[in-house]
């Protein structure tokens, strides 16, 4: 065995630069940790800035690889590429891991076999990584690889801020000493908001000064902060005031929490009129930060057939749960066609009150999970709002409980969502919540029932700016349901090319597959000033198959819809959005009254 003295050095890690704009201040490593460029080693800073200058001057790419999103990547082997492969020690017998440079014995630490440390919560992955080097020859290049692999193991173990040092030492005995310094919080800094809001955001972080930084805890706090649609918070790590400490920077962008909107949709039905006028407002901090309300009024243009009001409160609770309360009131008037006679003028009323209580769950980086519990009260004397043509002599009342699980997963190529909901009605709570009343409103239905639905969605980025979106919903039930609880299909949000909720059933599914073109800018083509827009075209295929549990003698076994079509999505700045879809029915639909020429679906909203 050769006796050697090791010169101190530290490991290098893979980093990527989110944008090569001259104002860029941070880099993001392969685990999603954003770090100030000033905190990088000098050689990595030089590579970043050299690549910036090369791109901005048009002289080529520079020393770092840059992808199509403008991310800069440092080759993980680059830092050790120039280090010697000469064998310093034939056989690595042991590794000693200590928390402070002062704990390193310059004369070496003979007699150690395997891995030695006195950390109370030493990550298992780090131990496995170090064990993989035991028994192998030692060189400067292999030691650099060990340092980088240890850093990687710490980060995949939920320790995002760690320094691994290899101080000068004697390794003649075959034992190498590593210094592992886990970052402890020095302070939380907030950028982008005024002083009063800074304190609120700082209080939402559960980590305290002097505590070690754990990515799962930090991610949970960040998910909570970003739950508000009026706020976007990015977290950045920076060196703290003292050795071994780290600052957390909450870089925050907020939007106006109060805005109102006007809109138009042709999402109605033939009986109630297809045109819909929308007016509403959102007041995100009506009762303080993250305590907001929203209101929407929906009607036909003449305010004759449909008048719908909905009010929603959403607010975070001090113990990190989320409360949503929805209330709606709808009145409808329609002329029901009667064969061989004049139409019959009827009116109906629908009332709903639905609180929801959501509990966020612990989840790894890139995931958001929560469970939700709720209750629904619904009162109705018609099914006109749900695509039917019936007004009843009595009013039905629904009292049902719900429970759900929701997960959103963000990965390197897109976003996936799954939403599972279950509903239970015990029945017989009031005179209008009885089997007799339910059977009168819907033959074969009872006031006690169970049903569940599952919604899934995947948004997938494709090469060259293309993208794909797949979504769908399915439902199962133990019996016939009232119209408000059935799954419906037809219209812009399920199967295009058909009237809204042209079919409905107790069970079944609908699904949609869309392919989007790369975005283009009309503003750039027309050379508009100070405005941004994005236009995408799409092609789609939609399908639905629905059925009832206890069918009447004249009901089909199932009803099916299929359509293909084209559409577009246009966003102009932050204030106008337009959707257009033309769907063409295909196949044998087994549904009466279908326009085989298809249907154009329009929706436009202007925000102020």
Where are these regions (language model features)?
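Immediate N-terminus of the mature polypeptide
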Residues: 23-455, 459-511, 515-608
């Amino acid at each position: 065995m050769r006796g050697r003295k090791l010169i101190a050095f530290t490991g290098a890690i893979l980093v990527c630069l989110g944008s090569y704009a001259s104002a860029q201040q941070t880099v993001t490593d392969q685990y999603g940790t954003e770090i100030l460029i000033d905190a990088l080693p000098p050689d990595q800073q030089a590579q970043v800035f050299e690549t910036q200058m090369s791109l901005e001057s048009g002289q080529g790419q520079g020393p770092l690889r840059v992808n199509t999103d403008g991310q800069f990547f440092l080759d993980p082997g680059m830092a050790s590429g120039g280090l010697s492969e000469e064998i310093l020690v034939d056989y690595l017998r042991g590794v000693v891991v200590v928390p402070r440079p002062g704990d390193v014995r310059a004369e070496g630490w003979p007699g150690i076999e395997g891995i030695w440390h006195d950390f109370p919560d030493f990550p298992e992955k780090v131990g496995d990584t170090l064990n993989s080097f035991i028994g192998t020859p030692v060189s400067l290049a292999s030691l650099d690889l060990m340092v980088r692999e240890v850093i990687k193991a710490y980060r995949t173990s939920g320790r995002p801020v760690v320094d691994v040092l290899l101080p000068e030492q004697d390794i003649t005995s075959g034992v190498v000493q590593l210094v592992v310094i886990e970052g402890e919080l020095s302070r939380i800094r907030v950028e982008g908001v005024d002083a009063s809001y800074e304190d609120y955001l700082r209080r939402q972080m559960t980590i305290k000064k002097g505590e070690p930084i754990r990515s799962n805890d930090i991610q949970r706090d960040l998910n909570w902060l970003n739950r508000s649609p009026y706020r976007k918070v990015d977290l950045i790590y920076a060196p703290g005031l003292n050795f071994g400490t780290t600052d957390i920077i909450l870089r925050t962008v907020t939007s106006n929490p109060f805005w109102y909107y006007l809109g138009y949709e042709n999402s109605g039905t033939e009986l109630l009129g297809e045109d819909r006028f929308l007016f509403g407002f959102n007041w995100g901090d009506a009762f303080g930060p993250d305590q907001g309300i929203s209101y929407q009024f929906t009607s036909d243009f003449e305010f004759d057939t449909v008048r719908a009001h909905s009010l929603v409160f959403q607010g975070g609770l001090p113990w990190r749960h989320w409360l949503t309360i929805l209330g709606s009131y709808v009145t409808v008037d329609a002329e029901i066609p009667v064969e061989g006679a004049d139409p019959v003028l009827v009116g109906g009323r629908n009332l709903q009150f639905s609180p929801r209580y959501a509990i966020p769950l612990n989840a790894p980086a890139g995931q958001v999970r929560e469970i939700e519990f709720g209750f629904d009260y619904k009162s109705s004397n018609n099914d006109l709002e749900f695509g039917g043509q019936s007004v009843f002599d009595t009013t039905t009342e629904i009292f049902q409980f719900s429970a759900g699980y929701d997960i959103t997963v963000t990965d390197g190529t897109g976003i996936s969502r799954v939403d599972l909901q279950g509903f239970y009605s015990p029945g017989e709570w009031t005179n209008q919540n009885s089997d007799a009343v339910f059977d009168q409103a819907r033959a074969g239905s009872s006031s006690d029932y169970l049903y569940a639905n599952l919604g899934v969605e995947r948004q997938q980025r494709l090469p060259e700016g293309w993208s794909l979106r797949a979504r769908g919903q399915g439902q199962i039930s133990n019996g016939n349901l009232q119209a408000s609880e059935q799954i419906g299909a037809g219209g812009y949000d399920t199967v295009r090319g058909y009237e809204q909720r042209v079919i409905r059933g107790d069970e079944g599914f609908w699904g949609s597959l869309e392919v989007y073109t790369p975005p283009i800018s009309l503003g750039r083509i027309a050379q508009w000033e100070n405005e941004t827009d994005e236009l995408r075209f799409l092609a789609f295929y939609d399908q639905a198959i629905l059925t009832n549990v206890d069918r009447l003698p004249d009901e089909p076994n199932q009803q099916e819809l299929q359509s293909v079509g084209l559409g577009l999505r246009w966003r102009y700045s932050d204030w106008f959005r337009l959707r257009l879809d033309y769907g063409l029915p295909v196949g044998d639909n087994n549904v009466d009254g279908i326009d085989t020429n298809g249907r154009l679906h329009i929706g436009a909203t202007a925000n102020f």
